[in-house]
């Protein structure tokens, strides 16, 4: 699994899980555009079905779209065939909507095991984890989330945030 990318430049990857979640997604897209920042959105398949216009808005804004499973169940609790179904179903939904298949996957809760690795290898998708976690599902104060990220951030870090938790635009803007 990829948890960071070795870089000398002061560059990090902003990633957002669990979307799309209108109206949070739109507010997040506006904030990212104001700051000239692109991000990777790891989308849940059931949200792709429910909010196709938000998925299209994310893609049209130039952000990368990754697969975050269909139902957001922990992959470790699923059979090999159920894992594969979660991956394929979500990738198919995204491809049918956007004309492009996602190439990245982030497991729900960051949990993975040998069965998931086998399924991802079969589908040619890397697992993208994170090494900087804003814990924005526990904390709603944007300043505390931002400080948590900034106290340990380094070039090449992959930062985990969520589309739809708390004041979504504040930590990224800071």
Residue ranges of each PLM-predicted region?
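Catalytic domains of cell-wall/extracellular-matrix polysaccharide-remodeling enzymes
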Residues: 49-50, 73-174
């Amino acid at each position: 699994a990829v948890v960071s990318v070795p870089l000398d430049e002061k560059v990090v990857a902003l990633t957002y899980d669990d979307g799309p979640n209108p109206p949070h997604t739109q507010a997040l897209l506006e904030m990212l555009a104001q700051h000239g920042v692109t991000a990777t959105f790891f989308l849940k398949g059931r949200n792709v079905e429910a909010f196709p216009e938000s998925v299209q808005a994310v893609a049209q804004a130039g952000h990368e779209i990754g697969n975050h499973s269909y139902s957001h169940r922990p992959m470790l609790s699923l059979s090999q065939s159920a894992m594969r179904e979660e991956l394929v179903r979500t990738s198919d939904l995204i491809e049918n909507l956007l004309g492009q298949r996602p190439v990245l996957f982030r497991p729900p809760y960051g949990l993975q095991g040998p069965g998931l690795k086998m399924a991802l290898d079969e589908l040619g998708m890397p697992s993208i984890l994170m090494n900087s976690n804003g814990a924005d599902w526990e904390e709603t104060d944007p300043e505390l989330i931002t400080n948590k990220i900034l106290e340990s951030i380094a070039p090449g870090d992959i930062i985990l945030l969520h589309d739809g938790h708390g004041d979504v635009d504040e930590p990224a803007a800071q």
